[in-house]
Amino acid sequence: MYDKTKPDMKKILNEICAKYTLADEVKQRDIYPYYRPISSGQDPLVTMADGSKVLMFGSNSYLGLSDDPRLKEAAEAAIRKYGTSCSGSRFLNGTLDIHEELEAKLAKFVGKDEAITYSTGFQVNLGVVSCLGFRGGFIFLDALDHACIIDGSRLSFSEVRKFPHNDMTVLERKLRMTPRNAPKLIVVDGVYSMEGDIAPLPKIVELCEKYNASVMVDDAHGLGVIGENGSGTASHYGLTDKTDLIMGTFSKSFGSLGGFIAGDREVINYLKHNSRSLIFSASMTPAATAAASRALDIMIEEPERREHLWEVTRHAQKAFKDAGFDIGHTQSPIIPLFVRDTFKAMTIVKMAYEQGVFITPVIAPAVPENDVLIRFALMATHSIEQVDEAVEKLTAIFKKLEVIS
């Protein structure tokens, strides 16, 4: 029975949520940049819900495969054979033969014993980091690790220790302060999703060997982009054998949805039977699985896609530098255009959109307040001419708002 003497919890929740005002403030200024509906595929030129067409420089489809006819055909064939859903967990009735086929291909691709797929990339990190964060152990996180890694660490039993971005001196100091025989897991992004730089994996591996730690690389933004055949950061450095766990997602270069973790057989077996976001979630849909599998084939068969991606990437990086932009230390198709002011960044996004360029703002807490930026992302399907058009328009906007001179 409802007790009238107790506070109205719904009202309290509403009051707490009402204290969040940033979105309303931005809407009042008419510079709200989120939830813009698109009514076409993620191609270089997309059609918005209002019928307008804009150049897309905000997508993670690095190889331009998300609208590829071959992936669509694979997805359609899978739906016809398996239906639209597996209607259950991988642990129970939700394992298909195409799941296992994809996992075998992924393990070979990244050079590991085995792989297991999850229904989203977020669930991979949530389930793996929490599961391997043993009681009495330690998890070491880079300050710019993705939110799902941070959330996974919060669900673990381990003590979490953060270190400044790519600061190996601080990481070593923190490792030195932990018991040598305690479980230690270092988790880093391979390619950092907001600023585009690459983790110093050689030094991390060296520290792992010195302090008896393991390393997990979230290669969501590295797979398809760097390494042999696009096999990622560990391959890029020639450190596949010394990288304990490699995580990847299918929503970027693979043009699908889902994720995976690959590693030694005993670790993957443990995760299969203990990772909660795997066991208690429905499995990847047949369509997503088939599309990811076909994308992996194309990734290997068509290196020219990656070569062109790097051609437009190098061109864009040089063009922005020559125009006076601060693009940080990017080493990838993710180019940060630092603005360092939240409202100004959102104003830039609106002005660019009105001129036919779709870009995205990155604000706190995704980055520190003084590192607010515009994320400019390239695809293998972009042309040099499209890049030049976007750079020209953004240069004029940044100068008008006095971000660059």
Give names to the regions the model predicted.
Residues 229, 235-270:
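Active-site PLP attachment segment
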Residues 128-147:
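Conserved PLP-anchoring active-site segment centered on the Schiff-base-forming lysine
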Residues 283-302, 312-314, 321:
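Structural motif of enzymes handling amino- and sulfur-group chemistry
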Residues 161-217:
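Active-site phosphate-binding strand-loop segment of PLP-dependent enzymes
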Residues 2-6, 15-84, 213:
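N-terminal "arm"/small-domain region of PLP-dependent enzymes with the aminotransferase-like
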Residues 302, 307-316, 321-355, 366, ...:
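Conserved PLP-binding catalytic core of the aspartate aminotransferase-like
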